Amino acid sequence: MGDFNVALTDRDVWDPAAFVDSTHVTPAERQAMQVMLDWGLLDVQARPGKGEVPFTYWDYRAGMMHKNLGMRIDYVLATRSVHVVDAWVDREARKGKGASDHAPVVVDVTL
């Protein structure tokens, strides 16, 4: 789990055209991330029926978070044996004074 700094698909950035020739979206970065998924790890935030997966990162400049102009570059990957009850992005933690530019991804599991 953690800050992979890769937007796996164009849906994981607020405007794909704004990130052409930029970090976080290069074919090499996306391929490296895809290798982990091909090994059998699952992106626990992107579960069937869950709907859109929220962004986890917003630049501090120009009020990007308030406009929801962000990226999903933080992931929790797990094997199928982990039963995920829920997963969400804690946007409130990101709003705190001195907070990181990344919001925590919270995952509730049963073992």
Predicted regions and their residues:
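Metal-dependent phosphoester-hydrolase catalytic domains
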Residues: 9-111
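Active-site metal-binding loops of divalent metal-dependent hydrolases
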Residues: 4
